[in-house]
């Protein structure tokens, strides 16, 4: 199947529309909210478009830290404001039903918002066999490594978890596990061994397209 991986949107309606026009399963890695230069209604339209596509089984959606910022105070981050809060609140039922903490396309292919770094993989003895069960167990509890916020991003942990890991300062790839994620802005899709950071829509209008 062809997959279109779409990086952090932050209110860019035109990028959502461009992605949805492509053939293949679209996977959005989160962060639709909290642009500093886009109006609230652009963010609302972004959510409405991806929610509709998800209901039609044309797309899948992963939580970003900027969505969780409005749902879990632990994840509160820059850009938070009351207009965006209302946008999320009005769609909370759909968001909680459709958004995922992560997606394993295969046991060896993980898609998340910010990536799973090798430090967490090693520390908690994760394997390809136990990865999905462990992540499902971690998701409801904000004190688990999935929700860690690293020192580099202003948190109390040595590295960030799947919503906060910084590509430049904290991420190390895991042998045998291909990963796609966003969160750390840069120019173009960046690759480190078998991992890809796709948060590039501020600088380069690129999606990552793969046959899996």
Regions found by a protein language model. Give the residues of each.
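Beta-strand-turn-beta hairpins that frame and shape the catalytic cleft
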Residues: 1-4, 104-111, 192-194
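Conserved beta-strand scaffold positions in the cores of enzyme catalytic domains, especially
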Residues: 3-5, 26, 61, 179, ...
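Core catalytic region of metal-dependent phosphoesterases/phosphodiesterases
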Residues: 6, 11-91
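Active-site metal-binding loops of divalent metal-dependent hydrolases
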Residues: 7-9, 30-33, 65-67, 114-116, ...
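Short loop/helix-cap segments at secondary-structure boundaries that form the rim of catalytic
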Residues: 17-22, 173, 188-194
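Short catalytic/ligand-binding loop motif for oxyanion handling, primarily in non-cytosolic enzymes
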Residues: 35-36, 68-73, 112-114, 118-122, ...
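Active-site-proximal loop/helix segment associated with metal-binding centers of metalloenzymes
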Residues: 82-87, 101, 106-172
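Binuclear metal-dependent phosphoesterase catalytic core
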Residues: 185-212
């Amino acid at each position: 199947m062809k997959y279109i991986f779409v990086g952090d949107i932050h209110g860019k309606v035109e990028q959502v529309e461009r992605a949805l026009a492509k053939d293949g399963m679209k996977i959005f890695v989160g962060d639709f909210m909290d642009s500093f230069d886009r109006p609230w209604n652009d963010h609302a339209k972004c959510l409405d478009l991806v929610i509709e596509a998800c209901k039609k089984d044309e797309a899948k959606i992963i939580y970003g830290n900027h969505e969780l910022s409005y749902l879990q105070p632990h994840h509160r981050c820059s850009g938070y404001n009351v207009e965006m809060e209302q946008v999320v609140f009005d769609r909370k039922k759909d968001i909680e039903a459709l958004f995922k903490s992560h997606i394993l396309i295969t046991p060896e292919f993980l898609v998340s918002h910010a990536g799973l770094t090798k430090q967490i993989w090693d520390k908690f003895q994760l394997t390809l066999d136990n990865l999905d069960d462990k992540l499902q167990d971690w998701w409801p509890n904000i004190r688990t490594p999935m929700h860690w916020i690293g020192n580099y991003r202003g948190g109390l942990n040595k590295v960030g978890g799947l919503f906060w890991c910084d590509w430049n300062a904290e991420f190390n790839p895991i042998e045998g596990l291909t990963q796609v994620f966003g969160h750390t802005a840069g120019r173009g899709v960046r690759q480190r061994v078998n991992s890809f950071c796709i948060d590039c829509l501020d600088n380069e209008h690129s999606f990552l397209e793969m046959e899996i």
